[in-house]
């Protein structure tokens, strides 16, 4: 059985330092036509408790994408529901 390789992305912080993250999942919301991504720092990916970061993103023409902070409570609630669903599926 082959191990599934996780997608990894580099996200610069506000100081321009680059950090490697492992993508947990992405999802689209049809009603708002927005896309979201949840990531964890690559060095924490195998730990039992990890800090999850979530962003809204827009894909660019050159296969890159731009990340935007999630600012509204409604958006956060939606992302948290997706994280909870994912956690429940992994426990099953």
Swiss-Prot record:
Report the Pfam families cross-referenced here.
DUF1292
Family designation: Belongs to the UPF0473 family.
Matching entries from NCBIfam families are given as: PRK13678.1-4, PRK13678.2-5
Q: What is this protein called?
A: UPF0473 protein OB2006
């Amino acid at each position: 059985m082959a191990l599934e390789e996780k997608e990894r992305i580099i996200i610069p912080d506000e100081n321009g330092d680059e950090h490697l993250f492992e993508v947990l999942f992405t999802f689209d919301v049809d009603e708002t036509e927005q896309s979201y991504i949840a990531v964890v720092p690559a060095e924490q990916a195998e730990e039992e408790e990890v800090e999850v970061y979530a962003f809204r993103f827009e894909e660019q023409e050159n296969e890159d994408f731009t990340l935007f902070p999630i600012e509204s409570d409604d958006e956060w609630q939606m992302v948290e529901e997706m994280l909870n669903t994912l956690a429940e599926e992994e426990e099953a």
